[in-house]
């Protein structure tokens, strides 16, 4: 369940970030609102980057064999 929550949190953060970017690009926000949105966007970006880094670490751990890391490119088409 923790994995689903983490995935949902990442997806929600990414969706929120996309919404903020659209609002900023629209150009209808005041300077103060733009700065607030920008600050929120920075926080969401950091959250997303942290989630991606954590996912990358998990993938590397799963690929570990015989005490050595065997890095392999991710291939979504490759059967498990």
UniProtKB/Swiss-Prot annotation:
GO BP term (any one): DNA catabolic process
One Pfam family in the UniProt entry: Exonuc_VII_S
InterPro entries: Exonuc_VII_S, Exonuc_VII_ssu_sf
Keyword set includes Translocase: no
Broad class of where this protein is predominantly found: cytoplasm
Its EC number(s): 3.1.11.6
Gene Ontology CC: cytosol; exodeoxyribonuclease VII complex
GO terms, molecular function: exodeoxyribonuclease VII activity
Top enzyme category: hydrolase
Superkingdom per UniProt: Bacteria
SUPFAM superfamilies for the chain: XseB-like
Catalytic function, reaction form: Exonucleolytic cleavage in either 5'- to 3'- or 3'- to 5'-direction to yield nucleoside 5'-phosphates
Keyword terms: Cytoplasm, Exonuclease, Hydrolase, Nuclease
Compartment(s) of residence: Cytoplasm
Role noted for this protein: Bidirectionally degrades single-stranded DNA into large acid-insoluble oligonucleotides, which are then degraded further into small acid-soluble oligonucleotides.
Subunit architecture: Heterooligomer composed of large and small subunits.
Family the entry assigns: Belongs to the XseB family.
HAMAP family found in the cross-reference section: Exonuc_7_S
Protein name as it appears in the record: Exodeoxyribonuclease 7 small subunit
Species of origin: Pseudomonas fluorescens (strain ATCC BAA-477 / NRRL B-23932 / Pf-5)
């Amino acid at each position: 369940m923790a994995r689903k929550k983490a995935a949902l949190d990442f997806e929600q953060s990414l969706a929120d970030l996309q919404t903020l970017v659209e609002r900023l690009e629209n150009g209808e926000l005041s300077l103060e609102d733009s700065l607030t949105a920008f600050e929120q966007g920075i926080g969401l970006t950091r959250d997303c980057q942290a989630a991606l880094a954590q996912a990358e670490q998990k993938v590397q751990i799963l690929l570990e064999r015989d005490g050595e890391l065997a890095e392999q490119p991710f291939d979504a088409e490759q059967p498990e």
